[in-house]
Design a protein with these regions (language model features):
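Accessory DNA-binding and partner-docking regions appended to nucleic-acid-acting proteins
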Residues: 1-4, 340-341, 346-361, 367-373, ...
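Helicase motor core with emphasis on the C-terminal RecA-like subdomain
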Residues: 2-11, 15-19, 23-45, 52-55, ...
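Short alpha-helical "packing" element that flanks the helix-turn-helix/winged-helix DNA-binding module
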Residues: 21-24, 375, 480
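Short alpha-helical segment immediately N-terminal to, or the first helix within
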Residues: 27, 304, 378, 482-483
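Generic structural hydrophobic/aromatic packing signal, biased to beta-strands
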Residues: 270, 334, 375, 404-407
């Protein structure tokens, strides 16, 4: 009989749940509503995908991000899950076919935009089939106090109330204040929900802040991107003009870059995002205000060219890096001009004729100013950046994490003082020690294993190209790295690699095993 652990291993290829995931899965399977606040990259999707495969009926996932739906459904289909999405990126014929198949029971998981819940055709389908669970992703969009309020989210409750029997509900978000969480509970009418906030700590992310005058930022940006080699990254800018100028700057240095912002037409945005997902573009440059919903696990760096409006936005955007658990760098370039730009937008929002009462707009502006204050503190602090972020989100924080620019600057200063004293002592004794050779980084591969890893990348690229898939949907970088380290020689051994489920092992396993066998054989 299937259970959460067997589904996790068989379908997704993981031996164990991440912190917080198993409790959420158990509660949903027991019929208890859930409100989960989990940072970007913490594995929210597993929390509802696993129970969706164990519940008797269909799970509907409400998401505001069209591109994310496509990516998540694509990944599920690759893992052998019957999943589909329904949004305006489909033609009318495709929508009709998808709904027809949904009525016939083809799918276990269906992703929809919130507006789709109001469509008569979708409502008829939901009346005819058993809906076991409704999951609301990016649930903070339901709150006027959240940074991404969407009025269509307010009608989710009406849809749920219209169903023949009430499904269990899960609400997930990366960041939510107490006020926003209260709005989520109220507007979704969650019944005695299990509420959980998992750790916001992402140990694999290196945080860095750099003060730079506007005239210095292009040089700083180029230095950062060129240092990353061919690794994929995202650069966030505060205006569409800066996005376009930054793309031109990067392209002038032969860096494959593309833009993503609201002023581009939908086809261009979709093409640019696909180019990034399929590794035809190395760097995506996007506006802070325009959420990409990118689900690319091997993003190795995120650079904020401008300071975002608040730490909630910053952490969510920075969290796009390193979703595969491998080391990644998050750099913030800031200047006093950034603060003035954000204040301009706050004032503009306060004066906007949007139908809200003056006192409500004034309170919203006050809260925005408060959030900006903490964003500014983060940008200028001399103390541990990780500690500052964790403390802001209400979590116990270390005084020093050892993996941010402030901690390393303090350590390097101390090391320089020690080195200076040592050299002075050595000089007085008329001797100088030879510098020690640096030890290889923990977890680094041998030269032979690096060669094998590159061969595995090549196989993945070929297999993905044949199916017109992003490479990470075959296997992510962390999975290939573990293959290069452990060198499985059979399908059974391959199934012990994290991220290898049964369907993927059957579909792709032999191609990767042949490369590993050749590499091992050539060394003997």
């Amino acid at each position: 009989m299937e259970n959460p652990h067997s589904i996790l291993k068989k379908v997704f290829g993981y031996d164990s749940f991440r912190p917080g995931q198993e409790d959420i899965v158990s509660r949903l399977l027991a019929g208890q509503d859930v409100l989960a606040v989990m940072p970007t990259g913490a594995g929210k999707s597993i929390c509802y995908q696993v129970p969706a495969l164990l519940l008797p009926g269909i799970t509907i996932v409400v998401s505001p991000l069209v591109s994310l739906m496509k990516d998540q459904v694509g990944a599920l289909v690759q893992a052998g899950v019957a999943a589909a999405f329904l949004n305006n990126s489909l033609t009318d014929n495709q929508k009709a076919l998808m709904l027809h198949r949904a009525r016939e029971g083809w799918y276990k998981i269906i992703y929809v935009a919130p507006e789709r819940l109001e469509m008569p055709g979708f409502q008829r389908f939901a009346q005819e089939r058993q809906i076991s669970m409704v999951t609301v992703d990016e649930a903070h969009c339901i709150s006027q106090w959240g940074q991404d309020f969407r009025p269509s989210y307010l009608r989710i409750k009406e849809f749920v109330d219209s169903l023949p029997s009430r499904p269990v509900m899960g609400a997930f978000t990366a960041t939510a204040t107490a006020h926003v969480r209260a709005d989520i509970r109220t507007h979704l009418a969650l019944q005695a929900p299990y509420e959980v906030t998992t750790s916001f700590d992402r140990p694999n992310l290196y945080f860095e802040t750099r003060r730079a005058l506007p005239s210095q930022k292009p040089k700083e940006l180029l230095e950062l991107v060129l240092k990353e080699g061919n690794h994929a990254g995202i650069v966030y800018c505060s205006t569409t003009r800066q996005v376009d100028e930054t793309v031109q700057l990067l392209q002038s240095r032969s860096i494959r870059a593309a833009a993503y912002h609201a002023k581009l037409d939908a086809d261009t945005r979709r093409q640019n995002q696909d180019d990034f997902l399929y590794d035809r573009v190395q760097v995506m440059v996007a506006t802070n205000a325009f959420g990409m919903g990118i689900d690319k696990p091997n993003v190795r760096f995120v650079i904020h060219y401008n300071m975002p409006k608040d730490l909630e936005s910053y952490y969510q955007e920075a969290g796009r890096a390193g979703r595969d658990g491998q080391p990644a760098r998050c750099t913030l370039l800031y200047s006093g001009t950034d603060v003035r730009t954000i204040r301009f937008f706050i004032d503009k929002e306060r004066e906007a004729d949007n139908g809200l009462p003056a006192d409500v707009k004034a309170e919203a502006a006050r809260k925005a100013e408060e959030r900006l204050k903490y964003m500014t503190f983060y940008s200028t602090t001399q103390h541990c950046l990780r500690g500052f972020l964790l403390q802001y989100f209400g979590e116990a924080a270390p005084k020093k994490c050892g993996n941010c620019s402030c901690c390393l600057a303090a350590e390097q200063e101390a090391q320089l003082q020690v080195e200076y004293a040592r050299r002075r002592a050595a000089q007085s004794a008329d001797r100088l020690e030879k510098p020690r050779r640096a030890k290889p980084a923990a977890g680094s591969l041998s030269e032979a294993d690096e060669k094998l890893l590159n061969a595995l990348y090549a196989v993945r690229k070929r297999l993905a190209g044949k199916q017109n898939l992003p490479a990470f949907m075959v296997f992510n970088d962390a999975t290939l790295r573990e293959m290069a380290e452990k060198k499985p020689m059979s399908i059974d051994e391959l199934l012990n690699i994290s991220g290898v489920g049964e369907k993927k092992a059957a579909r792709y396993g032999n191609a990767f095993l042949r490369v590993i066998e050749d590499a091992v054989g050539s060394r003997e």
